[in-house]
């Protein structure tokens, strides 16, 4: 399938627009504009004798939709690094299997003798209304509403025998523009030819962003409607997308393209990255965040030598739909320990609760308190870690601690497992995740129990500012750390320096190249980011000077508002 170019000579000059960077990376291709569905749902009253046929037609559309999603999920499960995509598609399958979408729709078709498209669309509309009524406006709600739209479009498409072209069918390099890019559209995309996504609205925490990130497809979003109307005029023209800076360049000159790709090629350097300080000292190292050991070959391919700075072990349960047994865990952890790199890998204990509910255990607690409540689950995970410690060293991170007593308790339980498994020697370094304000102010005591600490910036910002974790709906502020969060990071780093305990940063902030000068100035020793962001961070590091970073950080620590921080970091 091909895309034709734009003939208007007035549109041939290089033209740049800027949105919000969602997924980092550089991509080049023709602009493909996906239009909104043109289907108009009409309300029809059916003769009584056609009602059962209409119900049969609806069941067939549901069955085809389930088959579509099941095929996508199966494909995702079979690919490295696609576990989160599979989880999202599994959630779509669960929604489409909900009795409400069968019993309620069928009941209404029979009772009112209305056509399936109209009844199904009405039911989905009611579900959307109920979501909006019970949830405040957060990116989580937006995600769920988008999931409803995605499923609704798929089923109605089958009912009306109309489907959009799959993004897996194209055979030329494209940058896809869409007002509302859905998770299943992104999941369909072939990253060999789909080189970038651009949407009118979007969020870093959205399901679409998660899919794009897993596929390593750059993504830029959030434009004004006026600017989006301008974008439509450039359908079919050559586009360069810069997911690091949020820049979209239409009709890029050859010199512009060469500059981007030359700079990108220059960052194939080993880790830790060395920053020019006059003495060429390695001030900061970059590590990878992963959800599965299937992502390890991607690290080897994209950024050789990089260690794993955060293995999010709870995603094993999401992928399996249940808690993994000791043997399954030990197999995964052994693969992690044996992966060759420049440093010791970091495994985070199961981090369940709130937005990450355990598939088979419901609890009001989260993070380490969830683990301590579910002691059997914790002991099994510690047993798997103890078994693997025979192979090599491992750093183990305890999530969401509020004080030192929780760390001491986990370590005591681990010692019990060591004693039970005779002949196994402890080969573990224990770390604490600082993501709750109480931990910031108890940091001196926490450091006494920790060989390293990791700042979880997503939750730290949420609990400090009283916001949803999905802060993208705050507009430009979603990218900007609040002065209070910057000061908290500074406090933790300063206390850790006194105890000679290394500090790493993970979360969204760690993958934002604009924040690198701040972290360098604060004295952070390691950033743990998603794999596609690592080379973008390296590119940014090549431009930095330690003295300028220190000067900037002093100004940031004096800032009093979001706006002041934004001026210093992004303008």
Swiss-Prot record:
Needed co-factor(s): Mg(2+)
Reaction catalysis annotation: L-histidyl-[protein] + phosphoenolpyruvate = N(pros)-phospho-L-histidyl-[protein] + pyruvate
Sites where the protein binds Mg(2+): 435, 459
Intracellular or extracellular location(s): Cytoplasm
Miscellaneous comment as given in the Swiss-Prot or TrEMBL entry: The reaction takes place in three steps, mediated by a phosphocarrier histidine residue located on the surface of the central domain. The two first partial reactions are catalyzed at an active site located on the N-terminal domain, and the third partial reaction is catalyzed at an active site located on the C-terminal domain. For catalytic turnover, the central domain swivels from the concave surface of the N-terminal domain to that of the C-terminal domain.
Record function comment: General (non sugar-specific) component of the phosphoenolpyruvate-dependent sugar phosphotransferase system (sugar PTS). This major carbohydrate active-transport system catalyzes the phosphorylation of incoming sugar substrates concomitantly with their translocation across the cell membrane. Enzyme I transfers the phosphoryl group from phosphoenolpyruvate (PEP) to the phosphoryl carrier protein (HPr).
Family to which this protein belongs: Belongs to the PEP-utilizing enzyme family.
Protein name: Phosphoenolpyruvate-protein phosphotransferase
Organism: Chlamydia trachomatis serovar D (strain ATCC VR-885 / DSM 19411 / UW-3/Cx)
């Amino acid at each position: 399938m091909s895309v034709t170019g734009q003939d208007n000579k007035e549109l041939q000059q290089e033209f740049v627009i800027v949105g919000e960077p969602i997924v980092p990376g550089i991509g080049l291709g023709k602009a493909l504009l996906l239009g909104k569905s043109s289907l108009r749902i009409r309300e029809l009253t059916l003769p009584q004798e056609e009602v059962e046929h209409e119900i049969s037609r609806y069941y067939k559309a549901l069955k085809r939709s389930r088959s579509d999603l099941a095929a996508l999920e199966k494909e995702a499960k079979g690919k490295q690094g696609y576990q989160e995509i599979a989880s999202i598609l599994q959630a779509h399958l669960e929604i489409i299997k909900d009795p409400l979408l069968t019993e309620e729709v069928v009941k209404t078709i029979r009772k009112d003798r209305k056509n399936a498209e109209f009844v199904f669309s009405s039911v989905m509309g009611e579900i959307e209304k109920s979501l909006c009524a019970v949830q405040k406006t957060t990116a989580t709600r937006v995600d769920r509403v988008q999931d409803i739209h995605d499923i609704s479009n798929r089923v109605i498409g089958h009912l009306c025998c109309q489907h959009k072209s799959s993004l897996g069918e194209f055979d030329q390099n494209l940058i896809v523009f869409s007002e509302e890019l859905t998770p299943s559209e992104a999941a369909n995309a072939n990253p060999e030819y789909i080189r970038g996504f651009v949407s009118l609205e979007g969020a870093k925490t959205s399901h679409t962003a998660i899919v794009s990130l897993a596929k390593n497809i750059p993504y830029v979003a959030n434009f004004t409607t006026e600017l989006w109307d301008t974008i439509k005029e450039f359908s079919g023209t050559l586009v360069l997308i810069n997911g690091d800076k949020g820049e979209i360049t239409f009709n890029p000159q050859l010199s512009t393209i060469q500059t981007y790709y030359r700079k990108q090629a220059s960052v194939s350097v080993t880790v830790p990255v060395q920053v020019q300080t006059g003495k060429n000292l390695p001030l900061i190292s970059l590590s990878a965040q992963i959800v599965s050991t299937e992502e390890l070959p991607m690290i080897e391919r994209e950024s050789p030598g990089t260690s794993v700075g955060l293995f999010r072990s709870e995603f094993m349960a999401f992928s399996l739909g249940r808690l993994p047994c000791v043997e399954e865990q030990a197999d995964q952890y052994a693969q992690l320990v044996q992966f060759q790199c420049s440093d010791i890998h970091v495994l985070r204990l199961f981090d369940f609760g709130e937005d990450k509910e355990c598939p088979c255990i419901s609890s009001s607690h989260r993070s380490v308190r969830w683990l301590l409540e579910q002691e059997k689950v914790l002991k099994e995970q510690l047993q798997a870690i103890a078994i693997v410690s025979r192979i090599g060293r491992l750093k183990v991170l305890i999530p969401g601690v509020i004080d030192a007593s929780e760390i001491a308790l986990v370590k005591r339980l681990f010692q019990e497992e060591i004693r039970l498994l005779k002949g196994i020697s402890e080969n573990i370094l224990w770390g604490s995740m600082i993501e709750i304000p109480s931990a910031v102010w108890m940091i001196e005591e926490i450091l006494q129990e920790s060989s390293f600490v990791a700042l979880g910036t997503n939750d730290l910002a949420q609990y400090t500012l009283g916001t949803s974790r999905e802060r993208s709906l705050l507009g430009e502020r979603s990218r900007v750390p609040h002065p209070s969060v910057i000061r908290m990071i500074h406090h933790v780093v300063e206390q850790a320096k006194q105890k000679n305990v290394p500090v790493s940063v993970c979360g969204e902030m760690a993958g934002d190249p604009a924040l690198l000068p701040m972290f360098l100035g604060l004295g952070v020793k390691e950033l743990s980011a998603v794999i596609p962001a690592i080379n973008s961070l390296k590119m940014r590091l090549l431009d930095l000077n330690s003295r300028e970073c220190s000067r900037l950080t002093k100004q940031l620590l004096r800032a009093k508002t979001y706006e002041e921080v934004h001026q210093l970091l992004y303008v």
